Swiss-Prot record:
Belongs to the insulin family. The modification Pyrrolidone carboxylic acid is found at Q162. GO terms for cellular component: extracellular region. InterPro entries: Insulin-like, Insulin-like_sf, Insulin_CS, Insulin_family, Relaxin, Repro_Hormone_Insulin-like. This is Prorelaxin H2. PROSITE patterns: INSULIN. Relaxin is an ovarian hormone that acts with estrogen to produce dilatation of the birth canal in many mammals. May be involved in remodeling of connective tissues during pregnancy, promoting growth of pubic ligaments and ripening of the cervix. GO terms for biological process: female pregnancy; positive regulation of angiogenesis; positive regulation of gene expression; regulation of catalytic activity. Disulfide bonds join C35-C172, C47-C185, C171-C176. Pfam families: Insulin. Isoform 1 is expressed in the ovary during pregnancy. Also expressed in placenta, decidua and prostate. Isoform 2 is relatively abundant in placenta. It is in much lower abundance in the prostate gland. Not detected in the ovary. Keywords: Cleavage on pair of basic residues, Disulfide bond, Hormone, Pyrrolidone carboxylic acid, Secreted, Signal.
Length: 185
């Protein structure tokens, strides 16, 4: 008798779960028209909800198939094990390396001095230094930071901001779905 009761209770729970999923899907497709603070508050509320997930953002609800363990373990862990194995081999050979005397391992002072650049013409270096300062000042006058520009990092953040501002304009003037706001979480 208790098994039958638990079986019926399980069925009711599954039905309620399906109903809440249908309500959540229709809630995510609800069109809202908000501007300014109200839009930001709605975005925070949508992103802060614990009930939505990346799976609810996708249109299709494909069942998840279990993946093999090799796919779950990231590849960098395998690379780390290779590095650890190589380091352990190195440590095993370390006593042979320590047999070298300190004088053999350190180069002499004249050998080090040949790598130090000699300042022959200080006025020429001063002119190059002034040109470098002028170039830096002209780069600072540019609208974007030079370091980010050369690294290519500013384009991604600019594109992301432009996409979000376009979505904000659309939400303010036309309206947008909560699902489209949730994509920016």
């Amino acid at each position: 008798m208790p098994r039958l009761f638990f079986f019926h209770l399980l069925g009711v729970c599954l039905l309620l779960n399906q109903f809440s999923r249908a309500v959540a899907d229709s809630w995510m497709e609800e069109v809202i028209k908000l501007c300014g603070r109200e839009l930001v508050r709605a975005q925070i509320a949508i992103c802060g909800m614990s009930t939505w997930s990346k799976r609810s953002l996708s249109q299709e609800d494909a069942p998840q198939t279990p993946r093999p363990v090799a796919e779950i373990v990231p590849s960098f862990i395998n690379k780390d094990t290779e590095t650890i194995n190589m380091m352990s081999e190195f440590v095993a050979n370390l006593p042979q390396e320590l047999k070298l005397t300190l004088s053999e391992m350190q180069p002499a002072l004249p050998q080090l001095q040949q790598h130090v650049p000699v300042l022959k013409d200080s006025s020429l270096l001063f002119e190059e230094f002034k040109k470098l300062i002028r170039n830096r000042q002209s780069e600072a006058a540019d609208s974007s930071p030079s370091e980010l520009k050369y690294l290519g990092l500013d384009t991604h953040s600019r594109k992301k901001r432009q996409l979000y501002s376009a979505l904000a304009n659309k939400c303010c003037h036309v309206g947008c779905t909560k699902r489209s706001l949730a994509r920016f979480c």
